[in-house]
């Protein structure tokens, strides 16, 4: 094949989950040329045809086809002209060949035209147009090669998020596995393609599927040193799970190809918008339809978590099921305001020691809960900023609130110290007060002992007197 066709392309069925470097070199082969004039002329025509294809010479390709060159000519390694055209994602040539009758479902050793297009050496926009053209000619997106890899896996491996979305919209099985158990999500995670991972999660990819060696996509990302993807894939709740799963094919394609201006002609997809904490919470509960409503009313996650039923109605959340979902989630998260009104009242000077002790114990328990909550947040926050997957607001707001918290904690500490000193002073004054009335239990203990002894003595004398009289009468 021509020198420009010497690009490395994935071999038909020669892919491996352990090494993505298995390629074919479809360049020249060192072998002596044919000597017969007929075969020499044919080889020259084939060589000219291949050069025209790889250089994108549309007029020459059409001229050769008009002169009798077959649209299904077999080049080196059994490749057809269409295979060569999609390998460089030349949309115009692909369209010409298809219009001339080229087979969009052709495969060489189970390596299909569509697979070659997904692994092409070109820009994603060109690959996207090529793939869409092939799909319009009934190319099957679920055919697998000898290693059980499908076109969506090739696209995910190469990092083409838009191509992945288009294939899935046309019915590609998103959770299919190759011979080593890799899915499209696993391939994207392995190569660190964040945009593809996000798109696959949005399309409903299952991140819990394991490879044959028992690894999930997140663990594969971690093993290949992609900590950001590992963090994203390790989230308990998938904020993007299956957003487009329940759409029809036409609706999904429309959603995926919706852009501004002339972007629709260029088949560009809207970029992924990072999720904030409110969006993650709502998506986790299946309440993503409330996102716009809450944003319009400037309701933050913190405000949402502290709302009551009457607050929901006032803010337009009228669906009882939606209200209950939020309330159940709040209860599960144990997010609640400290209601000091429920603590024991201590303003009464006649309060008993048991009630006062109960108040202090409750206050101490609340402080312990707050400390544990802060410790949990510290343990969950990543050390490095590049590991943060979800969008955050200005860090200045967070640090400002933390500074206020520190001041409040210091004030609380000072007040508790004052309370402790006051209690200690009261105890010391009571001990040193000469007019102090002894506790009732002290007197009761001494009196009870005296009464017991007196009673025992009287009973003893009475018993002896009775015995003495009885003996005297008998005698």
From Swiss-Prot:
The SAM domain covers which part of the protein? Answer: 273-336
Q: Which InterPro entries match?
A: Ankyrin_rpt (IPR002110), Ankyrin_rpt-contain_sf (IPR036770), Asz1_SAM (IPR042650), SAM (IPR001660), SAM/pointed_sf (IPR013761)
**Localisation:** Cytoplasm
Do you know which Gene3D superfamilies this protein is assigned to? Ankyrin repeat-containing domain, Transcription Factor, Ets-1
> Membrane-spanning regions, if any?
none
ANK repeat segments run 44-73, 77-106, 109-146, 147-176, 180-209, 213-242
The UniProt keyword set, sorted, is: ANK repeat, Cytoplasm, Developmental protein, Differentiation, Meiosis, Phosphoprotein, Repeat, RNA-mediated gene silencing, Spermatogenesis
Q: How does it assemble?
A: Interacts with DDX4, PIWIL1, RANBP9 and TDRD1.
Name assigned to this protein: Ankyrin repeat, SAM and basic leucine zipper domain-containing protein 1
Tell me the organism. Notamacropus eugenii (Tammar wallaby)
Q: Which gene encodes it?
A: ASZ1
């Amino acid at each position: 094949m021509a020198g420009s066709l010497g690009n490395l392309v994935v071999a038909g069925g020669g892919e491996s989950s352990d090494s993505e470097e298995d390629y074919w070199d479809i360049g020249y082969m060192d072998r002596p040329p044919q000597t017969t004039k007929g075969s020499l002329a044919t080889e020259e025509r084939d060589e000219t045809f291949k050069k025209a294809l790889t250089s994108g010479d549309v007029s020459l390709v059409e001229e050769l086809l008009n002169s009798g060159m077959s649209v299904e000519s077999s080049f080196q390694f059994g490749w057809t002209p269409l295979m060569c055209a999609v390998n460089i994602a030349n949309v115009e040539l692909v369209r010409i060949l298809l219009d001339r009758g080229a087979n969009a479902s052709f495969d060489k050793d189970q390596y299909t035209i569509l697979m070659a297009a997904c692994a092409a050496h070109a820009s994603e926009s060109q690959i996207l147009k090529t793939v869409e053209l092939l799909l319009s000619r009934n190319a099957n997106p679920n055919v697998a090669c000898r290693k059980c890899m499908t076109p969506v896996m090739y696209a995910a491996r190469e990092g083409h998020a838009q191509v992945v979305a288009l294939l899935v919209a046309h019915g590609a099985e998103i959770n299919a596995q190759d011979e080593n158990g890799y899915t499209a999500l696993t391939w994207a995670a392995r190569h660190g393609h964040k945009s593809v991972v996000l798109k696959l999660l949005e399309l409903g990819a299952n991140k819990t599927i394991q490879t044959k060696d028992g690894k999930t996509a997140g663990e594969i990302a971690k093993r290949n040193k992609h900590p950001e993807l590992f963090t994203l894939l390790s989230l308990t709740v998938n904020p993007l799970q299956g957003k487009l799963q329940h759409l029809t094919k036409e609706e999904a394609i429309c959603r995926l190809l919706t852009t501004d201006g002339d972007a629709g002609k260029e088949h560009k997809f809207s970029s992924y918008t990072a999720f904030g904490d409110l969006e993650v919470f709502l998506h986790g509960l299946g309440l993503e339809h409330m996102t716009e409503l809450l944003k319009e009313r400037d309701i933050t996650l913190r405000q949402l978590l502290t709302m009551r039923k009457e607050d929901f109605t006032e803010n337009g959340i009228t669906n009882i099921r939606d209200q209950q979902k939020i309330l159940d989630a709040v209860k599960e998260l144990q997010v609640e305001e400290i209601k000091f009104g429920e603590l024991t009242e201590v303003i009464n000077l006649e309060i008993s020691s048991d009630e006062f002790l109960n108040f202090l114990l409750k206050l101490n328990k609340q402080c312990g809960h707050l400390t544990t909550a802060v410790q949990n947040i510290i343990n969950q926050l990543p050390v490095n900023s590049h590991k943060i997957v979800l969008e955050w607001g200005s860090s200045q707001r967070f640090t400002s609130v933390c500074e206020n918290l520190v001041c409040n904690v210091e004030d609380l500490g000072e007040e508790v110290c004052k309370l402790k000193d006051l209690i200690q002073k009261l105890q010391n004054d009571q001990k040193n007060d000469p007019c102090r009335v002894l506790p009732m239990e002290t007197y009761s203990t001494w009196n009870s002992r005296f009464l017991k002894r007196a009673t025992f003595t009287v009973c003893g004398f009475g018993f002896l007197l009775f015995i003495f009289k009885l003996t005297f009468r008998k005698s």
